From Swiss-Prot:
Its EC number is 1.13.11.5. SUPFAM superfamilies: RmlC-like cupins (SSF51182). This is Homogentisate 1,2-dioxygenase. Hexamer; dimer of trimers. Pathway: Amino-acid degradation; L-phenylalanine degradation; acetoacetate and fumarate from L-phenylalanine: step 4/6.
């Protein structure tokens, strides 16, 4: 292990340090978008080909494609699975009535108000991950293969004999409370708050809760697959480094019984009976796979001279659009960091943005909001809606001693930023946990303008 001078760490906690353990009992392969090969039973992977006449151990070969066959090689995503039964083996689907999780973003007027919500209440009756999903906002849809759905979840029960897949988009999971063990077709992801997980479009999985209750956020990405942002003049290293992304080794379930397969397809939920666990992939190879990332390993970039840089420097993952330089969705975080800029208002500045910003708080306190923005809560600042630090934060930062650094510690906020307006759902607008008085956080910002007295004025 690299030895570091402890005096240089100052107030950083051990679990915020890049050497912090990952707190899991699973095995992982490292790297972003790598070509992986893994088998839970030796000899299951064919050598030198994908689809032999007879697969070892009586398995079936099946390709899972995440991009078009003809996508450029550097962007092509697919994996070959060697499984006990093909994915086609299940009963007929029927429509499920589920009022809270959907893609109904409405066609009516979108209020330009700044919006904020307290945390989604935890359920009082047994509720698993799928039943606990609650749609907040979104844009676009699976038909156009662009845009996102923004959801939160609150659950207190594991998915035992129930499995889910989303044919509409890949799922970015951001746990806020409670640890998860996500059993997927290609292996098991252990997730805890301050880690994220990405489940590819179409990947079947079930979510096991490791604590009494769990809550968090989900971004359903209908557009281009998430990738690492270009670093430009930053260079070859920085932000989220590829080696810190982890993909599970092959693991499988060999269970038969009465199970339920739930699918999200074209904005609706469907269910089918299935007589076995669909998580029966014994071996696989390819680059279309689930992965996780520990946000505490993010290499934060900032100013060491003056001014607060644009928040794009905090981008972890980006979903590209058809317009170069403009993302379908950016996932950015606001982690522990030092602020040392001189002659500078150090918190995030007041802003109006052509993009739309959905924010959440995983842990601690967000440095631009002294009150009201709690872990598990959320805010939405849509296109050109003014936002920025509240009055208390502005007053404190305007008088701060800039000869000393501001150490932003013990925090983790994040943002889903989209190029299209995020349309809040009716249930989010009318929710009891919506903070109707959110705008009052800026009411204390008084006019302090005092024009200079000139000789002409006297």
């Amino acid at each position: 292990m690299i030895q570091r001078d402890p005096n240089l760490l100052l107030s950083w906690r051990a679990d915020q340090h890049p050497d912090a353990p990952m707190h899991n009992d699973q095995r992982y392969m490292t790297g972003f978008g790598n070509e992986f090969a893994t088998e839970a039973v030796a000899g299951s992977l064919p050598i030198g080909q994908n689809s032999p006449q007879r697969v070892a151990h009586g398995l079936y070969a099946e390709q899972l494609s995440g991009t078009a066959f003809t996508a450029p090689r550097g962007q092509n995503r697919r994996s070959w699975l060697y499984r006990i039964r093909p994915a086609a083996v299940h009963g007929s689907f029927s429509l499920v009535e589920q009022s809270h999780f959907h893609n109904d973003f409405g066609a009516g007027p979108v209020p330009p108000d700044q919006l904020r919500w307290s945390p989604l209440p935890l359920p009082s009756v047994p509720t698993d991950f799928v039943d606990g999903l609650y749609t907040m906002a979104g844009n676009g849809g699976p038909e156009a293969m662009s845009g996102v759905g923004v959801h939160v979840y609150a659950a207190n029960a594991s998915m035992q004999d129930r499995f889910f897949y989303d044919a509409d988009g890949e799922l970015l999971l951001v746990p806020q409370q409670g640890r998860l063990r996500v059993h997927t077709e290609l292996g098991v992801l252990a997730l805890e708050p301050q880690q994220i997980g990405v489940i590819p479009r179409g990947m079947r999985f079930r979510v096991e809760l490791l604590d009494a209750a769990a809550r968090g956020y989900v971004c359903e990405n209908f557009g281009g697959l998430l990738r690492l942002p270009d670093l430009g003049p930053i260079g070859a290293n920085g932000l989220a480094n590829p080696r810190d992304f982890e993909t599970p080794h092959a693991a499988f379930e060999q269970r038969e019984g009465t199970f339920e397969l739930v699918a999200k397809f074209q904005g609706h939920l469907w269910r089918a009976d299935i007589g076995h666990s669909p998580l029966d992939v014994v071996a696989w190879h390819g680059n279309y796979a689930p992965y996780r990332y520990d946000l505490r390993r993010f290499n934060t970039i900032g100013s060491i001279s003056f001014d607060h840089p644009d928040p794009s420097i905090f981008t972890v993952l980006t979903s590209p659009s058809d317009t170069h330089g403009t993302a379908n969705m950016d996932f950015a975080i606001f982690p522990p960091r030092w602020l040392v800029a001189q002659h500078t208002f150090r918190p995030p500045w007041f802003h109006r943005n052509v993009a739309s910003e959905f924010m959440g708080l995983v842990h601690g306190v967000y440095d631009a909001k002294a009150e009201g923005f709690a872990p598990g809560g959320a805010s939405l600042h849509n296109c050109m809606s003014g936002h920025g630090p509240d009055a208390a934060t502005f007053d404190k930062a305007s008088q701060a001693d800039l000869t000393r650094p501001d150490v932003i510690a013990d925090t983790m906020a994040f943002m889903f930023e989209t190029r299209a307006v995020l349309r809040p759902t009716q249930q989010a607008l009318s929710a009891a946990h919506r903070q109707a008085d959110y705008q009052q956080c800026w009411s204390g910002l008084r006019a302090a303008f005092q024009p200079p007295i000139t000789e002409d004025a006297t």
